[in-house]
Amino acid sequence: MPTYAPKAGDTTRSWYVIDATDVVLGRLAVAAANLLRGKHKPTFAPNVDGGDFVIVINADKVAISNEKLRNKMAYSHSGYPGGLRKRSIGELMEKHPDRVVEKAIVGMLPKNKLSRQIQSKLRVYAGPEHPHTAQQPVPFEIKQVAQ
C-alpha cells in the first residue's frame, strides 16, 4: 500500500481563537505557529499548507518581561543610506501591540515559499473583539506554568 500524501484540497480547516491575556509571548507564538502549519493533525506534511486559521485577541495584554520591554529592539530599514530605525519593544507595544505579536508568530514559521500562504491565515487583534464570529472559532487554551 503506498504512503498517503496529503494534497492541498484534502484538508478541512478549522478556526481557533487564542486569548493572549497573561500568556508569555514566545509560548503564544509557538502554539499559534503549530496551529497555522497544521502540525497537530495526523495528515501533516511540511510541503503542504494543511493548517488552520488562528485568531489572536487581547494582543495588548501579552506577557513580556520588563527587561525585554526596555532593552529588546525592533529594527526596520527604509532602504536608503542611514535609514535604519530601531525602537524598543515597549514603544511598539504602546502603539501597535498586534504587530509585535504577529512578528513573533511569523518568526516561528518556516522561511520558504509556503510561508506567505500560511501567514494569510493569521489574524491578530489588540482588543477582545474580532469580526470572525460567523466562522465559529473554537477557543484554544495554552497550557502554561503560572508566572
UniProtKB/Swiss-Prot annotation:
Keywords: Ribonucleoprotein, Ribosomal protein
Gene Ontology cellular component annotations, sorted alphabetically: cytosolic large ribosomal subunit
Origin superkingdom: Bacteria
GO molecular function, one term: structural constituent of ribosome
InterPro entries associated with the record: Ribosomal_uL13, Ribosomal_uL13_bac-type, Ribosomal_uL13_CS, Ribosomal_uL13_sf
Gene3D superfamilies on file: Ribosomal protein L13
Presence of the UniProt keyword Nucleotide-binding in the record: no
SUPFAM superfamilies, A to Z: Ribosomal protein L13 (SSF52161)
CDD domains membership: Ribosomal_L13 (cd00392)
GO biological process: negative regulation of translation; translation
One Pfam family per UniProt: Ribosomal_L13
Job of this protein: This protein is one of the early assembly proteins of the 50S ribosomal subunit, although it is not seen to bind rRNA by itself. It is important during the early stages of 50S assembly.
PANTHER family membership: LARGE RIBOSOMAL SUBUNIT PROTEIN UL13M, RIBOSOMAL PROTEIN L13
Family: Belongs to the universal ribosomal protein uL13 family.
Subunit structure: Part of the 50S ribosomal subunit.
Protein name: Large ribosomal subunit protein uL13
Lineage of source species: Bacteria, Bacillati, Actinomycetota, Actinomycetes, Mycobacteriales
